[in-house]
Amino acid sequence: MSMQDPIADMLTRIRNGQTAHKTILFMPSSKLKVAIARLLQEEGFIKDYKVEGNIKKKPVLKIFLKYFQGKPVIENIQRISRPSLRIYRKKTALPNIMGGMGIAIISTSKGIMTDYTARQAGLGGEIICHVA
């Protein structure tokens, strides 16, 4: 059976991993998943990420989850745009998550970036997910 929405699967693995207090998650890798993991690390939501695997093996994305005083750093991670219903926003209509305490990950013509970076660059795009 093929996976219909690999990004939703990634976000669900992160959500379930933090609920189970896991420190490391493993999942199939893709360029989009690595870009999302890079943003989550830059914004301080995860400790680190690594892509492992060689030519014969399929690449695996390892995500190291982050906790503060025993509680997950990511309180809420939610998929917004999905294959059956794409959500696009102009630069003036980009969401502000929790008054700037959270981020929206946006797919723009210049690549994957946070809502703050997209607003500064004057770009709109597809809203992939919200993280708080």
UniProtKB/Swiss-Prot annotation:
The keyword rRNA-binding applies. Keywords: Ribonucleoprotein, Ribosomal protein, RNA-binding, rRNA-binding. One of its GO terms (cellular component) is ribonucleoprotein complex. GO terms for biological process: translation. GO terms for molecular function: rRNA binding; structural constituent of ribosome. NCBIfam families: PRK00136.1. Belongs to the universal ribosomal protein uS8 family. Part of the 30S ribosomal subunit. Contacts proteins S5 and S12. One of the primary rRNA binding proteins, it binds directly to 16S rRNA central domain where it helps coordinate assembly of the platform of the 30S subunit. This is Small ribosomal subunit protein uS8. It comes from Baumannia cicadellinicola subsp. Homalodisca coagulata. The gene is rpsH.
